[in-house]
């Protein structure tokens, strides 16, 4: 574990969706240090709040080196002559709540997540780790099928849809450490769930799936009820909506326990 992640865990600083070692490496974020602070940097931005190497406290006053922070942490506020700008939401979920999905607030998702698997005979669909499919079909074969799922998913977005972090998405799809795949008995891939984690949260990175009615709901249900996820006893940071109103509505129907506004902060001139 690198210095920044170690300090966050030691100080029990609650991280945001961008915090994991796997994401740092796959996105090209660089860890830097000065005499006082450790911080993550990429493309001219300090990505998240710098943290003091001695005290473990996050930066609380801008200085000549730190004049902006791209994405804040929960409860992190920069006082003084500063301004902030909305970046995205963060949706936090409790995986335990997906085991029962009780109450009227769950009615829509509870109904919709059952619709996709009802189209198939019992036992036809399987949800397995990527390693199992590699053993059954071979690495090259599965990687080609994963690429096709990605192509189909991108095509379903429409020509005017902006895909953020598409290069990072491909790295996770082909080389992610935590991937589980929904497939049929012939190895046809319907969707892929991809995640990583930090000391506080499991980060649900990507759901890449075919454009089939109610498949997205079923993929989320499979992820949240998976014994691997349940056994970690962690909350899940499901990321934001990247300006997509449909995605925001979709996530709100899953009854998040927290919806946080993530902001960028700037020092006023």
Language-model segments: what does each one mean?
Residues 1-77, 183-212:
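Conserved donor-binding loop and adjoining core beta-sheet/short helix segment
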Residues 76-85, 252-260:
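Conserved acetyl-CoA-binding loop of GNAT-fold acetyltransferases
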Residues 78-159:
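Acyltransferase donor/substrate-recognition loop-hinge adjacent to the catalytic core
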Residues 178-268:
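Aromatic (often tryptophan-rich) hydrophobic motifs at membrane interfaces
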Residues 141-188:
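Short, conserved active-site entrance elements at the starts or edges of catalytic domains
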Residues 32, 59-71, 92, 126, ...:
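A structural signal for short, well-ordered beta-strand segments and their strand-loop junctions
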Residues 52-62, 108-112, 163-167, 218-221:
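Well-ordered, non-membrane alpha-helical segments in soluble/globular domains
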């Amino acid at each position: 574990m690198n210095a920044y992640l170690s300090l966050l865990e030691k100080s029990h600083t609650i991280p945001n969706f961008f915090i994991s070692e796997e994401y740092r490496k796959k996105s090209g974020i660089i860890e830097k240090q000065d005499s006082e602070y450790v911080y993550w940097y990429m493309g001219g931005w300090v990505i998240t709040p710098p943290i003091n190497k001695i005290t473990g406290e996050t930066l609380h006053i801008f200085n000549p080196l730190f004049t902006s922070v791209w994405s804040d942490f929960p409860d992190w506020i920069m006082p003084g002559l500063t301004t902030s700008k909305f970046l995205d939401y963060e949706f936090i979920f409790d995986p335990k709540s997906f085991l029962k999905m009780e109450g009227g607030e769950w009615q829509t998702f509870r109904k919709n997540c059952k619709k996709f698997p009802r189209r198939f005979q019992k036992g036809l669909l399987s949800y397995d780790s990527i390693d199992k499919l590699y053993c059954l079909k071979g690495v090259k074969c599965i990687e080609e099928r994963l690429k096709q799922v990605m192509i189909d998913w991108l095509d379903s977005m429409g020509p005017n849809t902006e895909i953020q972090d598409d290069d990072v998405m491909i790295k996770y799809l082909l080389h992610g450490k935590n991937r589980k795949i929904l497939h049929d008995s012939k190895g046809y891939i319907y969707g892929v769930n991809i995640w990583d984690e930090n000391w506080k949260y499991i980060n649900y990175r990507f759901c890449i799936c075919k454009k089939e009615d109610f498949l997205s709901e079923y993929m989320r249900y499979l992820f949240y009820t998976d014994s691997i996820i349940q056994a970690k006893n962690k909350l899940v940071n499901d990321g934001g909506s990247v300006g997509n109103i449909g995605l925001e509505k979709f996530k709100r129907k899953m009854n998040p326990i927290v919806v946080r506004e993530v902001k960028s902060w700037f020092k006023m001139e």
